[in-house]
Amino acid sequence: MNDNQNNNNQTAENVVETKDLTLSFGEDVAVQSLNMYVPRGKIFGFIGPSGCGKTTTVRLLTGFYKPTSGTLSVLGKNPADFTKADREKLGYLIQQFVLYPDLTVWENLNFAASFYGVSPFRGKRLNKLLEFVELSEHRNKLARDLSGGMKRRLSLAATMVHNPELLFLDEPTAGIDPILRRKFWDYFKELQEQGHTLFVTTQYVGEAAYCDLVGVMYEGRLLMVASPEGLRRRAFGGDIVGIKTTEGMSYDQRHQLEAQPFVHGKVKVIDEQENDVIVDEASAAIPALIEWCQTQKLNVETIEEKTPPYDDVFVKIIEMEAANG
């Protein structure tokens, strides 16, 4: 499987670029030959199971780890050469809560602002951040008394306090309920609209739908990068169209359908009346499928594009990788 993004798309508008990026700890390869780029102003989702190398990759991109081999550029520079001013263009939300439990929400945010040298007249910005993460009414509450979701929101506010250009968010929605996870993605979309670029790691495969580009990571290797829709199409070989006919389709008719130029691969039998086919473009193929059914004297009850969940997409990608050795 091709794990590289097209190098022809590497431009000055990419805030992250890597080439054959590899990190080994002794004989253990944590990240292997990573090739990717992150365009400015996009949300790049980095998806994969726990332990696949997502956090390690983030630590490479932020300069915490030095690569064993390969090259990388973040905001036009190697992280090893970052100055203090360069680092202040980054925001990094780590998985653990690292703010001070005995300080209030406001005190924690104010301390983070002072650490980054934000103007002493920063009250207005801090208030806006608390409002953004919906913690204004909890400003005087000690951090140790916050719920897990509130702690994640406070951590996000602290990550944003210096208005960084590029945000690395490592498992920002881990361990929180689905409603709050959706709220976080609403935050991320707002940050994108404000001009920020976001690199978000997650093991919740369904969150791919919120991203502009998605990289699928597995066992230290980047399997593919595509848009959410492109990910589905690459996993299944095109769009899936479900056809339900009144009479049911015979074996010979299925064989004839597979021979049509707009159909790829085998027809999948769902039941006696329903079959799924893979096509290039569902919108273009559906009229042709209806016409074919008419020539076969099959009465179409329903015909529609099917959208498999991203959990199924991820499983399919892993199966493809296993089949390719």
For each of these PLM feature ranges, what is it?
Residues 70-81, 85-86:
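Conserved ABC transporter NBD signature motif
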Residues 110, 114-138:
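Conserved ABC ATPase "signature" region
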Residues 187-200, 205-276:
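ABC transporter nucleotide-binding domain
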